[in-house]
């Protein structure tokens, strides 16, 4: 299972979801879907924008866990 740790990174960066959505160029609703793990996928361009906005690596946002 893939776990999305956007909330963890937001807390570390003291950034709001709305601010992140604006920086990345996605809607707050789409960011919410991603944060809750309900997204079926994520574009590399979105992942890249998330990493740039949060000053992190993809592995800081996405984590694989055995079921």
Task: Indicate residue ranges for each PLM-predicted region.
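A short, Lys/Arg-rich alpha-helix, primarily the initiator
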Residues: 1-15
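Residues within the helices of the helix-turn-helix
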Residues: 7, 18, 48
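Short alpha-helical DNA-recognition segment
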Residues: 15-33
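The alpha-helix within a helix-turn-helix
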Residues: 10, 21, 51
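DNA major-groove recognition helix of helix-turn-helix/homeodomain DNA-binding modules
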Residues: 45-60
């Amino acid at each position: 299972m893939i776990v999305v740790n956007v909330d963890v990174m937001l807390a570390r960066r003291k950034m709001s979801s709305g601010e992140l959505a604006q920086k990345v160029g996605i809607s707050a609703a789409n960011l919410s879907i991603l944060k809750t793990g309900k997204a079926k996928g994520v574009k590399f361009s979105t992942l890249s924008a998330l990493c740039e906005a949060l000053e992190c690596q993809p592995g800081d946002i996405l984590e694989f866990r055995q079921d």
